[in-house]
């Protein structure tokens, strides 16, 4: 699953560690989501979307 998390995080001036702390997850989780190695749970995807004031669909894209 592709996503825009890295671009949104960098645009907000946040480190992976800072975003992880705000979301209540590990830095490794943020890294894994950004690189597409891990698809977040629906609750985490919704939390991330709300954090960046976007819809889930604006952030996460299914590989086609």
Predicted regions and their residues:
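Short basic helix-loop element that most often maps to the first helix and adjoining turn
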Residues: 3-22
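Short amphipathic helical patch at the helix-1/turn junction of helix-turn-helix
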Residues: 10, 38-39
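Key DNA-contact positions within bacterial/archaeal DNA-binding proteins
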Residues: 17, 28, 57
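Recognition helix of helix-turn-helix/homeodomain-like DNA-binding domains
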Residues: 25-38
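DNA major-groove recognition helix of helix-turn-helix/homeodomain DNA-binding modules
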Residues: 43-58
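Short amphipathic recognition helices of helix-turn-helix/homeodomain-type DNA-binding modules
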Residues: 58-64
